[in-house]
Amino acid sequence: MILSDKDIFDYVNSKRVLIEPFNSKFVGPCSYDVTLGSEFIKYKEDVYDLKKSLSHNKFEIENSIMVCPLNHHLDETIIENYKEKYNVDCIVSGGLLGTTNEYVELPNDVCAQYQGRSSFGRVFLQTHQTAGWIDSGFRGKITLEIVAYDKPVILYKNQRVGQLIFSKSLSPADVGYSDRKYSKYAGQKSVMASLIKKDFEIDEEE
């Protein structure tokens, strides 16, 4: 059962669902809009070896970031010209990780799904790849996987980037996501790189 606007207000007001900060203007007919935070991660690897920790740069923006397609030519001159013309803090090409401003806590009988905004789809910008699912019992901020597929796109801190759709399960989970022993991203309060290498460590323990 998907929660409607009335349900979302009810769950938030009764503290069954926590969204912090919460803005009543961001409640849609059956979704809640979330906004872009200031922290990002850009991987440094030429090849992703998923059995190893992935080296990366973590950085913050004050106002805006330009995201370019992977094959978009950038050199120092172009970067400086872009910064001067568009007044952006940072310019990157290829994919990067971001995070929402919103911290979310779900009970064991509510799960959620993140979807990018249709307006972003119309400029060929994707803000999640395969990681839109949020298990019941999750506590933390939502990670964004950001890729521009056509032309460079300028994103602004605090702008709405997507929405959460909440669903109520038939019965509560015995153990919610953040209480599971092997949950890798429980309680995340800033952008986090992939911890998939821990899957192999877990498999070796079993």
From Swiss-Prot:
Q: Give the Enzyme Commission number.
A: 3.5.4.30
Q: Where is the active site?
A: 145
Catalysed reaction, written as an equation = dCTP + 2 H2O = dUMP + NH4(+) + diphosphate
Q: Which domain of life is it from?
A: Archaea
| Main enzyme class | hydrolase
Q: Which UniProt keywords apply?
A: Hydrolase, Nucleotide metabolism, Nucleotide-binding
Which positions bind dCTP?
117-122, 135, 143-145, 163, 177, 184, 188
Similarity section: Belongs to the dCTP deaminase family.
UniProt function note:
Bifunctional enzyme that catalyzes both the deamination of dCTP to dUTP and the hydrolysis of dUTP to dUMP without releasing the toxic dUTP intermediate.
Q: What is this protein called?
A: dCTP deaminase, dUMP-forming
Biological source species: Methanococcus maripaludis (strain C7 / ATCC BAA-1331)
What is this organism's lineage?
A: Archaea, Methanobacteriati, Methanobacteriota, Methanomada group, Methanococci
The primary gene name is dcd
